[in-house]
Amino acid sequence: MDSLTPTAPETLAAAVVTTLAVDADPQAREASIFYWERGQGHRKAVVEAAGNTGDAETGRLAAELRDRPADPRLHHALTRRLVLAAERGPTPALTTLFDRAWQAEANSRLGYHLGRSYTATGQASLTSGELRGRAGGPRLAEGDTPEVLVVIPFRDRGSGQRLRNLLACLQALRDQTAPRGFYRVMVVETDERPRRREVIEPYTDHYLFAHKPGTFNKSWAVNVGVVNAPGSAGCVCILDADVLADRDFIARNAARFRRPGVMGHLSYRDMWCLDETSTSRAIDERLWQGVGRAETDGLRAFVLRRPPGCCVWVRTSAFHRINGMDERFEGWGGEDNDFAYRMDINSAFDHYDDQLLHMYHPSSAVLREDGELVNAHIPALSWGPSDVPIGDPDRFVSQASAVPNG
C-alpha cells in the first residue's frame, strides 16, 4: 500500500463493505444515478476481489451482503471478518481487496452511512395523511417584515411521497429557534394544475401556483418564487422539498451573513440520502418526538459527496446580480452546478459542514444514452444578465391549451 492509503483495518474493511453495498443496493443508484454510473468500474473490481479472498466465510458474507445490502447484521459481520483477517496477517488476496476497495472509495462521490442502532425493522412508513393531521404551527403575524425568504420549488404527480416530504419539511421549518417573524416560507408548485394546494397552504406562509406542463423546471420555479414573493427579504434560501431541517437551521444560516463580504453559501458538504425506514424514523423524531435534530445512529443513508444544490443560501442582491437560476434547464441535472459555479465566480461563496438529511422518494432522474446528464448540452456559465425578465409565472401558460389537465 502507498502512503496515500490508510492502514487501519477498520477503515479498509469499511471501504470494502461500503463499496459492495453501494454496488448492490438499488437505492444507491436512486440517490444519484450520475455518481453511481461513474463509479462502476472501481466497484466491479472490488466485487471480483471479494469473491477471491480464499476465505470461504468472507466470500459467503460478501455474497449475502450483495443479496441483502440493507441488512445491518451482514454489514457488521463482514466488517468484523475482514478486520480479524487483517489482524492475523493479510494475505496477498486480502491486500488486493483492500487496495481495490480504497481506490473505489477514493474515486467515488457516493458513500454510505449505517448507524450503530439502525435495524431496518420496527418503523412503519409515514404517509402524507399522517402529516396532514398535525397542526400547522405558528404563522407570520400581520405587520411582520421577514429578513429571510425560503423558496421551495415543488411538484408531485405520484403517490404522495414527495408531498409527505414537503409537509415534513414545512413543519420542521415552523419549529425553529429563529423568531417566527424573521423568515417567510414560500412554496412554488409548478404543474398542469394546482394538485396539492389545499394540503400545502396551511403549512406555508405563501403559496404560488405556476402553470408548467411537461418536465419539471426547478430553475424557473425558484426564480418565480424569488421574483414574486411578497416583502423584500435580504437573503434567500433555495431549499429542496425533501430536506428535513434541524431546529437551528434558519438562525444558524442567517447568522453567517454577518461576516463581511459573504454573499452566499452551501450549508453542507455531504448530503445524506435516507432510505425509507430512516426517513420515517427521522420525521418521527424531529416532529412527533420534538427533537431538534434527528439522531444519526439510527439512520441509514447513501452519502452524496460535495453535491452542489438542495440547500443554497444567497443574498437577494447576489441572486439578481447573476440573473438567478438558468431557466433553460429542464428535467433533472446540472442546474444546481451551474448556479453554484456562477455564485462562486461572482461573489464570496462559502461552504459549511452542517448535517443535511434528504428524505426518500423514488428517483425520476435519467441519463442520456451517452451517460451524460440530460442538460449536458447547455454551456456552463452561459447564463447572465439579460433584458428578458426572469421568474415570469405565466411563461408556460400558452401551453395550457395543448396539454389536458391530469
List each model region and its residues.
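A conserved acidic beta->alpha catalytic loop
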Residues: 158, 179, 188-198, 243
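Conserved donor nucleotide-binding strand/loop of the catalytic core
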Residues: 201-217, 228
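Conserved catalytic core of nucleotide-sugar-dependent glycosyltransferases
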Residues: 246-327
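Cell-envelope/extracellular polymer assembly enzymes that use nucleotide-activated donors
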Residues: 147-151, 338
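Active-site nucleotide-sugar/metal-binding loop of Leloir-type enzymes
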Residues: 220-235
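C-terminal catalytic/acceptor-binding lobe
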Residues: 2-129, 162, 306, 316-317, ...
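Short, acidic, metal-binding catalytic loop of nucleotide-sugar glycosyltransferases
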Residues: 168-182
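Short beta-strand-to-loop acidic/aromatic patch adjacent to the donor-nucleotide binding site
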Residues: 232-244
